[in-house]
């Protein structure tokens, strides 16, 4: 039985609590927040604490779902005794802090996971299988919603675009060149377009908008053999294959990814990893993601 705690009881923290109820062989022993949320302790039949040391002393694993600017502080506290730590994305936005986290993680052999949930999106996982023997020429991401009043301690690059940067790295590998532009309002980036040139020659284009009336999550992929159009919200995937026969018409097939809860799958994977030796290979990818986000910000603010 793994004793787990949740640090941060905002919207994302509560989402984690709801999903932890559906995972076997864990015990939710403590929830922590600076603001009193005792009603949540009663609802989830656990202990509420305003003392982070209580959390540290009693947990085998913890989930940090606090504002981004506090991630580093809570990681330092939790890493004193806890060996399994899950932190919502982005891990941090400061490169020096990221390097310090890597150093501590390696020295103390901490199992550290970062909440890039789209890797667990069933549509993305199905696309990954479809692309197994297919060379990608181009990736096109569009991610929009109306989060203008919700993004407070960062901007859309680290809040929204980082998801698609992660998927670009996941599907097509390292990036060698970045070109970006965007719209700023009151020193915050509200709209951004970025082109990433990968080392394997694939070109990724990402559009992110935090002030759009319509919520969109799409991924369009051009490969040597076909064109794939995916809706990450509805799980619909349309595959258009080139017809090399006598007929000029291309062949089109529509499929749907299974209806799975991405956050639940992500948390199950984290709990499973708590029982194994630390494997933090993905931290290198997340570090590259942070570097890319910083470069995109730099280019937009310099324009």
Label each region the model flagged.
Residues 1-43, 271:
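N-terminal Rossmann-like dinucleotide-binding module
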Residues 86-87, 112-114, 230:
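Hydrophobic residues in well-ordered beta-strands that form the structural core
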Residues 115-122, 147-176, 286:
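Mid-domain beta-loop-alpha active-site segment that forms a flexible
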Residues 117, 223-284, 299:
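C-terminal glycine/acidic-rich active-site capping loop/insertion
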